[in-house]
């Protein structure tokens, strides 16, 4: 879907958001967090290895459970 061409880019980014993404998805670098976020935003499906890497990341809810979360539940989850 995409060319796979990689370039170096300097960006100003919220360190707290990056750290939260790294914790949530157990990512080992800022680059991994930004890469995952862009792929999810653009909609490119995760490859098999990428999907397996997320296994056990702590996100284990059904769609029904997610839809039933209140704002308070979401805030508590963000704080953990």
From Swiss-Prot:
Cofactor binding summary note: The heterotrimer binds 1 Mg(2+)-Mn(2+) pair while the heterotetramer binds 2 pairs. Both metals are shared by the toxin-antitoxin pair.
Keyword check for Manganese: yes
Key words, A-Z: Magnesium, Manganese, Metal-binding, Toxin-antitoxin system
Annotated Basic and acidic residues bias: 71-80
UniProt keyword annotation of Manganese present: yes
Pfam family for this entry, one: VapB_antitoxin
One GO term of the biological process aspect: response to hypoxia
Protein name (Swiss-Prot/TrEMBL): Antitoxin VapB15
């Amino acid at each position: 879907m995409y060319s796979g061409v990689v370039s170096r880019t300097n960006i100003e980014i919220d360190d707290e958001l990056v750290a939260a993404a790294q914790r949530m998805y157990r990512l080992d670098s800022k680059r991994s967090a930004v890469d995952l976020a862009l792929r999810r935003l653009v909609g490119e499906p995760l490859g098999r290895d990428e999907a397996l890497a997320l296994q056990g990341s702590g996100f284990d809810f059904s769609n029904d459970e997610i839809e039933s979360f209140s704002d308070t539940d979401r805030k508590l989850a963000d704080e953990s």
